[in-house]
Amino acid sequence: MEHDGTAALGWAARDASGHLSPFSFTRRVQEEDDVTIKVLYCGICHTDLHTIKNEWGNAMYPVVPGHEIVGVVAGVGAGVTRFKAGDTVGVGYFVDSCRACDSCGKGDENYCPTMVITSNGTDYGGATTQGGFSDVMVVRQDYVLRVPASLPPDGAAPLLCAGVTVYSPMVEYGLNAPGKHLGVVGLGGLGHLGVKFGKAFGMKVTVISSSPAKREEALERLGADAFLSSRDGEGMAAAAATMDGIIDTVSAGHPLVPLLSLLKPKGQMVVVGAPAAPLQLPAIAIIDGGKRVAGSGGGSVAECQAMLDFAGEHGIAADVEVVAMGDVNAALGRLERNDVRYRFVIDVAGTLHAAAAPS
């Protein structure tokens, strides 16, 4: 590596329009425990959309988004022992943590209060982090993940965020027991992976959606055992107290009480979708039946590696539409309209430099 860092090319947003265009910048110098990664594919997450449009008020322009990254190791520092050149690896939502707080001590780096996120974060040297809509990453080896050879690299990319977001709470809260009944609310990028993991765990899986048109998709394409329209009052009543657990992946505002009615006594609902408006939760809805509601955000390094290994063993990959970097703005527009089944993934290595070339 050059003494002054590694030249990088990405696509960045410069303002709240969210429009992306080519952006040249410099990655930090590869240190002793760093892995330099040639980016192959990067998924597009709703978080990227929120960030580049400054919908959360924290954008530090220019912003290179992307935190669902699969690539190949191009170089390693002298102290790196876990990876070598040519390995297929992944990088998820964060690239560093303090390693000193209570959460880090417990292996829950994803809850570290000073966690360094992969894009639009601030590293411990004060620099703004730039994400995977770029040709190269430099990441500490402790935050790099090994991607099983059995997984397609494009379909593996969304597992680094969407995959671990559903896998982690399923394992943490015991919603992975064979023979148990799992409800998956929503059939988007998160929900379709919840179905796949649930079936691989040996569970009975029911998809719950406000869109009856998704019935065939849930049952025929994804292999869910049942489909329940949340708009079907009779169907919801018939399914009351039948589910051991529910993963709620919906990011639009929606009532929780009808979903809680589906749980058996002492059932567990885990919320991983994040609606902008507060969710309404009357106390009696959880007191009656001793039901529990929890939240979950992403997953730790160990959980993410376990998820990738499990996915590799069971052939679980995201259903993706691969797009060229030159089409990324159109893809972001479609994502905003929920016009994707189920995740967009950018072919970074194959299209980034061509898209940036003068026409």
From Swiss-Prot:
The keyword Nucleotidyltransferase does not apply. It catalyses: (E)-cinnamyl alcohol + NADP(+) = (E)-cinnamaldehyde + NADPH + H(+); (E)-coniferol + NADP(+) = (E)-coniferaldehyde + NADPH + H(+); (E)-sinapyl alcohol + NADP(+) = (E)-sinapaldehyde + NADPH + H(+); (E)-4-coumaroyl alcohol + NADP(+) = (E)-4-coumaraldehyde + NADPH + H(+). Binds 2 Zn(2+) ions per subunit. Zn(2+) 2 binds at C98, C101, C104, C112. The keyword NADP applies. Zn(2+) 1 binds at C45, H67, E68, C161. Disulfide bonds: none annotated. Its cofactor is Zn(2+). Pathway: Aromatic compound metabolism; phenylpropanoid biosynthesis. InterPro entries: ADH-like_C, ADH-like_N, ADH_Zn_CS, CAD-like, GroES-like_sf, NAD(P)-bd_dom_sf, PKS_ER. One of its GO terms (biological process) is lignin biosynthetic process. PROSITE patterns: ADH_ZINC. It holds the Pfam family ADH_N. GO terms for molecular function: cinnamyl-alcohol dehydrogenase activity; coniferyl-alcohol dehydrogenase activity; zinc ion binding. Its EC number is 1.1.1.195. Keywords: Lignin biosynthesis, Metal-binding, NADP, Oxidoreductase, Zinc. NADP(+) binds at residues 47, 165, 186-191, 209-214, 249, 273, 296-298. Involved in lignin biosynthesis. Catalyzes the final step specific for the production of lignin monomers. Catalyzes the NADPH-dependent reduction of coniferaldehyde, 5-hydroxyconiferaldehyde, sinapaldehyde, 4-coumaraldehyde and caffeyl aldehyde to their respective alcohols. Belongs to the zinc-containing alcohol dehydrogenase family. Homodimer. PANTHER family: ALDEHYDE REDUCTASE. This is Probable cinnamyl alcohol dehydrogenase 8A. The gene is CAD8A.
